[in-house]
Amino acid sequence: MRRISALLTAFLLTLTCLTAMAQTPAGKIDGTIKDENGQPIEAVTITLLQAKDSGRLKETVTSKTGHFTFDNLPTGKYFVTASSVGYSQLYSRVLELGTGRLAQTLPPLVMTGVTTSLHEVAVVGRRPPIEQKPDRTIINVDASPSNTGSTAMDVLEKAPGVTLDKDDNISLKGKQGVQVMIDGKPTYLSAAQLADYLRSLPASAIDQIELMTNPSAKYDAAGNSGIINIKTKKNKLKGFNGNVTLTHTQGVYPKPSGSLNLNYRTGQFNFFLNAGYSHWEGFQVLQINRKYLDADAAQTINSIFQQTTVMRFTNPEANVKFGMDYFLNQKTTLGFVVSGFRNKEQDRSGSNIQLMNPNYQIDSLVYSPNTNNTTWKNGSANLNFRHQYDSAGRELSADLDYVRYSSISDQYFNNLTYSPDNVLLDQSILTGTLPSTINIYTFKTDYTRPLAKGYKLETGIKLSYVNTNNTANYYDVVGTKSNVDTTKTNAFIYRENVNAAYVNMTKQYGKWTVQAGARLENTNYYGHQLGNGLTVINNDSSFSRSYTNLFPTLYLTYQASEKNQFTLNYGRRIDRPAYQDLNPFLFFLDEYTYQAGNPYLQPQYTQNVELSHTYNRSLTTTLNYSYTQNFFTQTFEQSGQATIVRNGNIGVRQNAGVSVSYMLPVAKWWTAVLYSDVNYTKFTGVLYGQDLDVQATTLLVNVNNQFNLAHGWTGELSGFYRTKGVEGQVVVYPLGQGTAAISKKIMKDKASLKLAVRDFLYTNKPHGYIDFQETDATFNNRHDSRQVAMTFTWNFGKPLKGMSGASKKNGGAGEEKSRVKAGGNAN
């Protein structure tokens, strides 16, 4: 409670010091963008400029009605520009805001379609599925019909530059260690928990996904490969409105889901409610073959292990989010958000294991029917504040957050050993109960201020505190009696505190824009293995560490011409071990495979450099290089016939690559988004006393074809292909997937039907091999990836008369606003 009180006090003090803010006259400029047929154009980039020197002030994008608004403008002369792929750039007349006329509405601005040199066809502008910005790539989830009935993990898997390994660990441009954020906030989940969460988060709840390979100092330094920010939907229209989405997905097993989004905004208040439910069923078939070798020069085979595990899971999940914004005036907003979800996963598996001699003759057979039932709950609360001093961009925001995760897993392992002629030789039953809780407290504040001579200052602080409690109670079952297994029963607590402060300075020199920043982070953590007091192995032990690091960033942008832009950026980042990865006790997957933590695991540090060129806002080419020290990844240690999987620091990772992203207007009705990257990765170090020196070059190709057909029909054909790659000890063979979808607007464009088929060739089957110590292993993994999904979406309600929600539309300069409405900024 003391920590909560301290954070709340800091939050209230921040608000109190702002109660005497001076009020200045605030003007407004708005307008509408239409095409040559008089139809509104969505997602057009609108830039507000000063008439005296053409200096850029703000940027936004048009709403679905083609509307845009710039609020809180001081008196002066302005004009706007409108730009969108497939249209000629448009300039408005000069508008003057002065005493007696603080609001100006432009007449409808008509954009003219341009003709490409490819086939001399016109291109229709619309919200693209993928947008390439100087500092990030944006995935517009609803723009792709193939996202129908999918999950956040499915969307990420086909995102440009994103790859998933055999355990669904996420890599960005060939590098692991990505920080995944939800609405600008870290999840604080382990890799396995994050994968489970993303598999349960429906794509229908997501608005955008931002991919940032080298974020500025404003963001957490965590994530050596960058940040993936998943922005959930937030209704922005005034009045009462909402939508209902119903989806049925069918693979081998059914996966129904539904969601409801409501929003009511009137006067000084905005209320919103999002709720959803999904019931996913699926399967996984995992085949593992291990050859145990003698430690002699010949590496002769000592024994052979072949395992086939069939898993069936059921995963019902319910989620809800409720929030309110109170607009004190045009400049100041207070808000709160509460949310939660409940997930109850039931996993049932059966493993058939053959233990053989070097001549492939069976020595024994093991059959293991296992169950693992996990109930996972989350609750969070946020208080947020935002104040815009003026239209020049001076702004202050503050957030106070509390997040709690709790879970309990009930495990049952039954191992039956048979002779080659199927005579039962032995049976062992192990049960486990593993409760866990995570509590997270954060406070942060951000301040932005334009300074004299064109400088812009950004600064802020963030304080976070995390505590976790984990217990593992294991029992050996003999007959009807359960006895405590003292070699496995354990308890572990972990505490972590990170204090951060950052500063960014931006300045434009003619065609050059320079941003230099630095983030200082102080980390303190403490882990305590409580033990069970019954064995020497699990006696009480603890560890702690404190360290402070500086993380500089630098961005140089050169606008060579209207169509050519060059960007060079540098950043230093950190990736801290997940608290579960520091937990030293074992977690059982089956009798021959364990997971364990490593209390000696150190953070890894990465230096990233990128050079990119963007042509005509459609073709972006990027060169990148990164160097990671203390690189940690999943390692495999052999203990008898059992394999122990744990994270370990293995040495140095170097990554060099080139990527190309191109939005190609093939025809008036056909736009292709092409992405490709080539990455060279090298690992050097020492692992379990053996030298490690592995390298690989991997090609990733991602193609997304969007078809804008007549009479409200749209279609998509997309896919990706990845050649062989390496991650530490693991080599993964080529992998790919194809997706097709079609969508139709109905009910006077208030509703839509979407049909999608994912992995229609059933090629998304991760497989590869692992060489470690005196063991060679291969693995093959297939799951319920081939699916057909049908979705119905109905949008209802309408804005109040004379009121527009465009001021809350998420645009280039509205990122902070969007994050505040989500309950906070990404920091």
Where are these regions (language model features)?
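Short acidic/polar hinge/loop motifs at secondary-structure boundaries
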Residues: 97, 186-213
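Outer membrane beta-barrel strand-and-loop segments of large Gram-negative receptors
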Residues: 431-432, 440-444, 485-490, 596, ...
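Structural signature of Gram-negative outer-membrane beta-barrels, strongest in the C-terminal barrel
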Residues: 400-403, 436-442, 448-469, 483-629, ...
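Outer-membrane beta-barrel translocator/receptor signature
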Residues: 221-228, 236-287, 315-318
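N-terminal periplasmic accessory domains that precede
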Residues: 108-110, 152-155, 194-196, 211, ...
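Extracytoplasmic beta-strand/coil segments of soluble accessory domains associated
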Residues: 153-190
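Short, acidic, small-residue-rich periplasmic hinge/interaction motif at the N-terminus
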Residues: 34, 39, 45-49, 83-85, ...
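Short, acidic Ser/Thr/Gly-rich low-complexity loop/linker segments typical of extracellular
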Residues: 51-67
